[in-house]
Structures are given as C-alpha cells and as structure tokens.
Amino acid sequence: MEVILLERVAKLGQMGELVRVKDGYARNFLLPRGKALRATAANRDKYEHMKADLEARNIAAKAEAAKVAEKIDGHNVIVIRQASETGQLFGSVSVRDIVTSFEAEGVMISRSQILLDAPIKTIGKHAIEVAVHPEVEVGVSVTVARSAEEAERINRGEDISTRREDQDAAAEAIAAAGEFFDPDAVQDDEEQPVEQ
C-alpha cells in the first residue's frame, strides 16, 4: 500500500514522502496513529492543504523535544538489582525499568522513546539512546548496581570486580609474607634441587 507520511518515521522516510509499505503496517500502525494517509488523489490534495500546518506543528514539537533533550542529555539513572558475584543479573533491566527510574526523578518518557536493542543483563554503566522526537535523539546512561554505594563506585569509575575489603586483605597478606621471606637467604645444601 502506498501512503503519504505526515511526519518523519524512522527507517521509512521524511514528512511528505510517498512510500510503499506492507498493508498490515499501514493499517495497524501508521494510519491509526496519524503518521500517514493513504495515497489517494483526494488525500494528496488534503496533504497539500495541511502541509503548512503540519510543518508548523512539527517545528513546535521539535522545539519542545529539544528542551526535554537538553534536560536529560547525559543524564544518569540508577537501577538497583540483585546480581551474582560475577556481575550477572538475576533477571534483566528492561525498557520499563528505565522508564520507571526516569519517572522517579521527575522526567516523563514513554517506553517507545527508549532505544534499547536488548535487555541489560550485567552490572555496570550502560549507554542508551532516547528518541524524544523522530528528529531528536539524546544519549543517557543507566547504572546497574547491587546497592546505592556500588552505583556511586561505578559512577566514579572504580573497578567493582574486586571489593575494597579483598584488596586490603591481599595487601595485609603480602606484608605478612614479606616478614617470613628473606630475600638475602642462601639455600642450604639439603634444600638444593636434585639433578637427574
């Protein structure tokens, strides 16, 4: 089916373009959401009359989206989840979880605006894209951690694979081993390796 796009649609075309799409995509998505009109002679005339109004609305929506984009550009949300010692999550962080985290901070974003290829399944800082308007995308980060303290460590760039207590214990063990090891010691004859 041929349709006339009333707004920019990702991976399809710009406003005003005449594009051929599958019938189901047009009937179930583009037409009901007001993103396109069937490409009939009457609708082509209708589009020409609506063109200036549509462009003005698009410019206003883009300006509003730019304000939201400026507010959230580089924003970091924290999601707390249970995870194994290796950093694998018990479950995953989905688009819904990210939207909930944004809403908790007072930023209203719909699930369809979050561009996430696959759910997040590991602890760490993950970069994602948010499409606040078909022509305006902004990068944000999602920090997934076991606790708020761990999230702060991740955001500071610290390595969370080893815990601070483990590092202190290792340093003490090395110091204790140094007390028992004499670098100037000479091997006794009894301790000489046997040559064969």
Curated annotation (Swiss-Prot):
Keywords: Ribonucleoprotein, Ribosomal protein, RNA-binding, rRNA-binding. GO terms for biological process: translation. One of its GO terms (molecular function) is structural constituent of ribosome. InterPro entries: Ribosomal_bL9, Ribosomal_bL9/RNase_H1_N, Ribosomal_bL9_bac/chp, Ribosomal_bL9_C, Ribosomal_bL9_C_sf, Ribosomal_bL9_N, Ribosomal_bL9_N_sf. It comes from the Bacteria. GO terms for cellular component: ribonucleoprotein complex; ribosome. Belongs to the bacterial ribosomal protein bL9 family. NCBIfam families: L9 (TIGR00158). Binds to the 23S rRNA. This is Large ribosomal subunit protein bL9. The lineage of its organism: Bacteria, Pseudomonadati, Pseudomonadota, Alphaproteobacteria, Hyphomicrobiales.
